[in-house]
Swiss-Prot record:
The keyword Membrane belongs to this UniProt entry's keyword annotation: no
Keywords: Lyase
Activity regulation information from UniProt: Shows highest activity at 0.5 M KCl. Does not require divalent ions for activity.
Pfam families documented for this protein: MC_hydratase
Keyword hit for Lyase: yes
Name used for this protein in its record: Mesaconyl-CoA hydratase
NCBIfam families, per the entry: methfumCoahyd_Halo (NF041625)
GO molecular-function term, one example from the UniProt record: lyase activity
Catalytic activity from the UniProt record: (2R,3S)-beta-methylmalyl-CoA = 2-methylfumaryl-CoA + H2O
Gene field: mch
Amino acid sequence: MTDWTDPDALDLSDGETFDSLLDRADTREKGHFFEFFAEGDELAHDPGLRLSHHGSEQWMGQTLNHDPAYWRADTAQERGFEERPVHPDYLLACVMGITVEDLSEKGGYFLGRDDVEFHQPATAGTPLSVTSTVVDTRTSSSRPKYGIVTWETEGRDRETGETLVSYRRTNMIPRREPAATDGGAVGEQDEGGPAMPDTLLSPDGERFGDFQAALDTAREENAAVAYRHERGRTMDDQLVAGLPLSTLNTARQHHNRDEMADSPSGDIVAYGDVTRSIALAHARSDEATYREQRFADERFHDFVTLGDTVYGFTRVLDCDPDAGPERAGAVTFEHVAFNQEQTPVYSGRRTAHIQRHQ
């Protein structure tokens, strides 16, 4: 009888022998299929990532987020922070990255995120504790090999229990067994919204008063406050693979080119939060941001792959002079990221406090 624990029992340098072994070996799977999730399930995510200035600065530098409040202690104190915080985009990406292994590592489509709220600033050295609750599961009539799952996720300070950020996200998740389907559409067909006005206005500056004045003028002239941002950022290996891995995001679509070769994208794709952060960086470069507040109706419309360039477009929806601290007012924006083919790849609504004129 052969002792298969003997290191010399198999010649693994023989390609034919190794191929035969691979064909016969079981694969230890990672992640969960759609059938694993049931409404009401609560999942505690194990990875204990600790926020760091290095991670935050790496994220900001790569995505063009240059707000000095997240780089310098003096500016942070001027903005009312007790100490220099990590960037909220980095915080959100870390919290979501931790959840991927349990929720969406099997792949599928990131359909969107809603009700994103930052409850308080997060600082370097904070250990994260992340939990998710399944709030809805349903079949997909258009894609029987997938189901649709929605989770509510909270990221907390592991030591104090205080909630830092929360959100709701929805993904298509592969099914272990395809569902029976009539092949019908998922919902009603989009009949299109109202046409945009002929006139598009841009604010004259980056302060709250500039946005409010532009919006007031637009309402009087039946126009819209909407504009493009000049900067673009081309997706490279660091953005597509490096940043997701640094947040413990194990989704294969961001770093396994072999796995993705036969996928609809044909290559590894960018983490949605990287694309989002670049688009928001373009917008923030044209405003005097004081503090981020919340995000809603975030959608990811198309793949972003290596070599694609991400640009930004912004529409101003509302200005509230009474919301926020004395030195800032609240502005609600709609942001759209688009690629070099002018194809939208991300959209979302954002409310931020914007500094007033001093």
